[in-house]
């Protein structure tokens, strides 16, 4: 019977300890206290024995586009153009995509150039919010 077969039915703490002994898990990922069941990451404070809440947030995507519709309440449709290079012919091709964007104060109008930022899902298709209006339509 191999060591892996013996560890298959073991408790999670024992499996983590066995994996650390075999070198499959980095030592930094295994908790020193078996009662903590292999706490991971920088959010675990070994001295206090508690898990600290990580309040940092990852970088959110930003896009710049043109408002093409403002008919809905607190929602605008923004068209974002990107240039992609064709893999074989190397010609730059214009691609556009429409995003539904949350506009809390209904301040964007058709023709405005706006900066939008990724956010939590607000509805089925709305996952962006208005960050700022770069230039107004004339």
UniProtKB/Swiss-Prot annotation:
UniProt-listed GO biological process terms: translation
CDD domains cross-referenced by the UniProt entry: Ribosomal_uS17
Coiled-coil regions listed: none
Domain of life the protein comes from: Bacteria
Signal peptide region: none
Residue stretches of biased makeup (Basic and acidic residues): 1-18, 43-55
Described purpose of this protein according to its UniProt entry: One of the primary rRNA binding proteins, it binds specifically to the 5'-end of 16S ribosomal RNA.
HAMAP family, per database record: Ribosomal_uS17_B
The family this protein is said to belong to: Belongs to the universal ribosomal protein uS17 family.
Protein name: Small ribosomal subunit protein uS17
Gene source species: Rubrobacter xylanophilus (strain DSM 9941 / JCM 11954 / NBRC 16129 / PRD-1)
This protein's encoding gene: rpsQ
